[in-house]
């Protein structure tokens, strides 16, 4: 049986680069079936005559009998032909080689590159302006298109690049059809000077892919690599924005037929842009991207429904005051605390227990609701845009408080059918568990000493592990770089070996005819020496790879050990601080607390002064009123560590403490809440600024900030007023 096909002639010679390619010689005749072109998803009537626009074609070289892929830029169209149809198979996108006879303008176009991602935008922007505009237009016009990213527009390379070079703010991208937009998006990634996922990231991802770990651990490891790799954060921000776009596409997969796998096949060559030596490497890059897309989908697919628009009455509860309560006053709002601390607070709680914290993303105004459901913690992002809040578009709530109040009365099933639970039990930062069981001050003091010793020991162990982890991570990276250098060296030596082998036969035959045995032996000796050197390098590389594998496993064990210690460290610190707070509230002097804590302030000129005689008692020595950060730094510069002042903060209703620590001026916010002044919850319990200053005259600020291991020892104006 025959089918319709097309006939082409090779204009340039081509040497196959991959297993699936075929060789071309000038004048070779090639045939391609119509079914094969249709399977590409980018074929339109009449395009068979323009093979350079189709890209890579799959057909048969009638001169050699080979069947496989060849570049459309290397052939010309001859006409129609009846041929036996092959079985078409889909292929991921592949960049075309430049034809040897291409015009100068085309060659210059190939050399075109966009600015580096780090030059295109800076945080808090979430992505490059052109990329954002392109994706917004694609999602608005072609989210449900069945040919999205699989059809090709008739626009030339120059036209696509004109789109990418334009000012994103002044151009309406919706004027272009969806095929042009999708082509421009793919061209954007090809024209970047460096791939979105650089080789540094890819090598670490490849190592992770070959490890025998669970899928959840693999996803976490990939995300850690993306964030921790030594590349500008604009790269992972761009990747993060693109993954969100893929998530939107997957939501409409029933119409656009795009799955995580198909998207990975299309975009992995564009995002990785690696020169693969085997099909396995190509499969790995596709699998890595598929895992990232699927993890984005799994995290967010539990939120398909939109929240209903709340009625005005839902914001007001029985007491009639919640609708005006600020977020800072809400008992369930914990501010900037870590995920580990959240997990600790929600451990073993009942379904419906919840709290809200600042989101870990860089977007200002976003928050994360953590809810207990089914014995697990569910993380739900609270978005903020144009003064409105919500879990997903459209954002309809006027505040986070209004949003939480609504779902305390209504089930979250309105938002997500899988979350059939109300926000029933807030984890209150005002009502912490009473862990102090002893009833005498001396007994509590002894317990404080015990917990402090345990905390310091555990903290030292964590610090040692962190140093080991940092050291091994650096060594691992150095060894990976060395292995890459070995590969390049081996390649060079093998090329030399092939060259010498090629020409040695001719020279040996020549010298044999001349009877020059000495030159023959010299050639053979050099060849054997070269082979021996290659063997030595290969052995060195193999030993280094074995060492790298062992050290990678060691590094992973250190990381696991650090993660296992962290919850204990948080719990010990929490317990110690609650004992310390209990003693402080009982009126125990700081000198006695320091004895129990093992703190010594031998350099403090006020350590033997009674509290009522301290210069801190005179607010004029440290309260400088309304000055800015620069003025505060000028006042403190050159002073000894522990010299401090308190000023009005740029944050309304709050104050700021500026203090010398390790030779630098550091700044921290002093909160003012209904419970009192303080640096952080649950320490906002001082009735006045003076009371707070007197307390931290003896107590280090390190419990609030690891870089502030200092007390408020010396008021900035103290010596002038003594």
Swiss-Prot record:
Biased composition regions of type Pro residues, renumbered to the chain: 85-98
Role this protein plays: Binds to activated (phosphorylated) protein-Tyr kinases, through its SH2 domain, and acts as an adapter, mediating the association of the p110 catalytic unit to the plasma membrane.
Origin superkingdom: Eukaryota
Keywords: GTPase activation, Phosphoprotein, Repeat, SH2 domain, SH3 domain
Classification lineage: Eukaryota, Metazoa, Chordata, Craniata, Vertebrata
Protein name per UniProt: Phosphatidylinositol 3-kinase regulatory subunit alpha
Organism: Xenopus laevis (African clawed frog)
GO CC list: cytoplasm; nucleus; phosphatidylinositol 3-kinase complex, class IA
GO BP, one annotated term: insulin receptor signaling pathway
Residue stretches making up the SH3 domain: 3-80
MF (Gene Ontology): 1-phosphatidylinositol-3-kinase regulator activity; ErbB-3 class receptor binding; insulin receptor binding; insulin receptor substrate binding; insulin-like growth factor receptor binding; phosphatidylinositol 3-kinase regulator activity
Residues at the site labelled Arginine finger: 150
Domain Rho-GAP: 112-300
Disordered, as annotated region: 81-102
């Amino acid at each position: 049986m025959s089918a319709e096909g097309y006939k082409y002639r090779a204009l340039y010679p081509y040497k196959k680069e991959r297993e699936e390619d075929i060789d071309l010689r000038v004048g070779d005749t090639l045939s391609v079936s119509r079914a094969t072109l249709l399977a590409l998803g980018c074929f339109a009537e009449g395009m068979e005559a323009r093979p350079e626009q189709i890209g890579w074609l799959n057909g048969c070289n009638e001169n050699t009998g080979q069947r496989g892929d060849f570049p459309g830029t290397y052939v010309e169209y001859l006409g129609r032909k009846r041929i036996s149809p092959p079985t078409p198979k889909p292929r991921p996108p592949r960049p075309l080689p430049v034809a040897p006879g291409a015009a100068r303008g085309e060659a210059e176009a190939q050399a075109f590159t966009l600015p580096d991602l780090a030059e295109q935008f800076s945080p808090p922007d979430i992505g490059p302006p052109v990329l954002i505009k392109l994706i917004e237009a694609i999602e608005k016009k072609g989210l449900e298109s069945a040919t999205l990213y699989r059809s090709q527009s008739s626009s030339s390379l120059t036209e696509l690049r004109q789109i990418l070079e334009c000012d994103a703010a002044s151009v309406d991208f919706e004027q272009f059809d969806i095929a042009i937009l999708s082509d421009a998006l793919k061209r954007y990634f090809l024209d970047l000077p460096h791939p979105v996922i650089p080789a540094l990231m890819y090598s670490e991802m490849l190592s992770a892919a070959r490890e025998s770990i669970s899928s959840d651990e693999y996803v976490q490891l990939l995300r850690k690599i993306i964030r921790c790799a030594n590349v500008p954060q604009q790269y992972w921000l761009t990747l993060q924005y693109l993954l969100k776009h893929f998530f939107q596409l997957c939501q409409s997969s029933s119409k656009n037929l795009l799955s995580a796998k198909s998207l990975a096949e299309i975009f992995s060559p564009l995002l990785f842009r690696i020169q693969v030596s085997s099909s396995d490497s190509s499969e790995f890059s596709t699998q890595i991207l598929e895992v990232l897309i699927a993890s984005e989908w799994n995290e967010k697919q539990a939120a398909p429904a939109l929240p209903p628009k709340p009625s005005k009455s839902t914001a007001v509860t029985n007491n009639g005051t919640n609708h005006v309560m600020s977020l800072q006053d809400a008992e369930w709002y914990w501010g900037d605390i870590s995920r580990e601390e959240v997990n600790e607070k929600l451990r073993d709680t009942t379904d419906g227990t919840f709290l809200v914290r600042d989101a870990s993303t860089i977007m200002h105004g976003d928050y994360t609701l953590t809810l207990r459901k089914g014995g697990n913690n569910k993380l739900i992002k609270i978005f903020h845009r144009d003064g409105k809040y919500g879990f997903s578009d459209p954002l309809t709530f006027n505040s986070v408080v209004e949003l939480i109040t609504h779902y305390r009365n209504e089930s979250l099933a309105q938002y997500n059918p899988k979350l059939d639970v109300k926000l029933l039990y807030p984890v209150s930062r005002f009502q912490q568990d009473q862990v102090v069981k002893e009833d005498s001050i001396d007994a509590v003091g002894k317990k404080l000493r015990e917990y402090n010793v345990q905390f310091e020991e555990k903290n030292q162990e964590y610090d040692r592990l962190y140093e080991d982890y940092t050291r091994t991570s650096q060594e691992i990276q150095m060894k990976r770089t060395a292995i890459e250098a070995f590969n390049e060296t081996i390649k060079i030596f093998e090329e030399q070996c092939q060259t010498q082998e090629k020409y040695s036969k001719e020279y040996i035959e020549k010298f044999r005819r001349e009877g020059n045995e000495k030159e023959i032996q010299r050639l053979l000796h050099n060849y054997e020496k070269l082979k021996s050197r290659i063997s030595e390098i290969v052995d060195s590389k193999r030993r280094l790879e074995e060492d790298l594998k062992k050290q990678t496993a060691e590094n992973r064990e250190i990381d696991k050990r650090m993660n296992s210690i962290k919850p204990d460290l948080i719990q010990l610190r929490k317990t110690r601080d609650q004992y310390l707070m209990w003693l402080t509230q009982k009126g125990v002097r700081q000198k006695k607390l320091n004895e129990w804590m093992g703190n010594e302030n031998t350099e403090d000129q006020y350590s033997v002064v009674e509290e009522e005689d301290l210069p801190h008692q005179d607010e004029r020595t440290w309260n400088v009123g309304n000055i800015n950060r620069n003025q505060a730094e000028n006042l403190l510069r050159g002073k000894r560590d522990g010299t401090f002042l308190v000023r009005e903060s740029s944050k309304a209703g709050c104050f700021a403490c500026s203090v010398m620590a390790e030779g630098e001026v550091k700044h921290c916010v002093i909160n003012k809440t209904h419970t009192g002044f303080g640096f952080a919850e649950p320490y906002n319990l001082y009735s006045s600024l003076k009371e707070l200053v007197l307390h931290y005259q003896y107590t280090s600020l390190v419990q609030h900030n690891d870089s502030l291991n200092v007390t408020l020892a010396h008021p900035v104006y103290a010596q002038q007023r003594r």
